[in-house]
Regions:
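Short amphipathic alpha-helical segments with heptad-repeat character
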Residues: 17, 21-32, 133, 137, ...
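N-terminal, Lys/Arg- and Ser/Thr-rich interaction peptides
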Residues: 1-25
Length: 160
């Protein structure tokens, strides 16, 4: 009868166990690296939004936002904490909070998400300046590449 001896199997099993224990941290680092690429590009896109102090009308819409609205977008943009959901792990990038322009309708300031959406899609008094969709689309490949590099680097640290 033939005999076979396998050496190093215990080491491989230990590496795989270490990998499974550290998987959430590897996923977190990978997701944040990819989101960071998109977020950096989005910050540049926000800086590129034209400013306009005029008040738009349907007959004469503005093409841009007020400087204080732009400042609110710049300051409120960020990445959410990682969440584990049914279909996997997610991080989101977006706008939060309110800018400093207080109105009768918004005494606490205008919602930054509302301003970003109105710039992206346009309104009856503002022409669209689609910066979000364009930035996400152009950043996708670089973000995926960075995520793959980070993942491989983290796995290679464990699987020596």
């Amino acid at each position: 009868m033939a005999k076979m001896t396998v050496r190093g199997l215990e080491d491989k099993i230990a590496e795989l166990e270490a990998l499974s224990i550290q998987a959430p941290e590897i996923i977190r680092r990978t997701l944040y690296e990819g989101a960071g690429v998109v977020a950096d590009n989005m910050r540049q896109a926000i800086q590129g939004i034209p400013t306009d102090n005029r008040i738009g009308t349907p007959e004469n819409p503005v093409y841009g936002i007020q400087p204080l609205q732009k400042k609110g977008l710049e300051e409120s943009f960020g990445i959410t904490p990682m969440k584990h959901e049914n279909d996997g792990y997610n991080v989101l990038i977006g706008f939060d909070g309110y800018n400093g322009i207080r109105t009768k309708k918004y005494p606490g300031g205008q919602p930054n998400q509302l301003i970003a959406r109105s710039v992206e899609r346009g309104t009856s008094f503002r022409r669209a300046y689609p910066f979000i969709k364009k930035t996400v689309r152009s950043s996708k490949a670089a973000a995926q590449k960075k995520m793959l590099e980070t993942y491989e680097e983290e796995v290679n640290k464990i699987m020596k």
